[in-house]
């Protein structure tokens, strides 16, 4: 496979898109005004930064960190087979699973992989566990 073929295959497989960061809930990893590249992975892992649909507001998407997967413990609770826990890195400015509870796999929309704008913040978004 040529480089162009490999690049095209990768592009089509992961369906990249972009997202604008609007609030401070993911600071310092992501800041208001950042533009990031997002992909649709086959697998999500705790530590990934994800675009998630708010469970109580259909169509409203947020950027959060995936902190626990099905079967993992959050405090006294063990997450069910289709329950994922998301939180903002800057807890005091975040509305997340601590307020609305776990989200489903269907509500996980994409994985944030890199910031491309502004140029001074360009770089990979690293999963943190």
Language-model regions, residue ranges each:
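Extended hydrophobic leader/signal-anchor segments used for secretion and membrane insertion
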Residues: 1-129
């Amino acid at each position: 496979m040529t480089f162009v073929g490999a690049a095209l295959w990768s592009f089509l497989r992961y369906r990249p898109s972009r997202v604008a960061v609007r609030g401070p809930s993911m600071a310092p990893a992501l800041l208001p005004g950042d533009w990031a590249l997002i992909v649709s992975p086959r697998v999500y892992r705790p530590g990934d930064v994800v675009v998630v649909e708010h469970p109580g507001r259909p169509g409203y998407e947020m950027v959060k960190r995936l902190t626990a997967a099905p079967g993992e413990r959050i405090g006294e609770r063990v997450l069910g087979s289709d329950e994922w826990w998301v939180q903002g890195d800057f807890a005091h400015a975040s509305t997340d699973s601590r307020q609305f509870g776990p989200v489903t796999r269907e509500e996980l929309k994409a994985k944030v992989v890199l910031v491309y704008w502004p140029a001074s913040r360009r770089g990979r978004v690293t999963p943190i566990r």
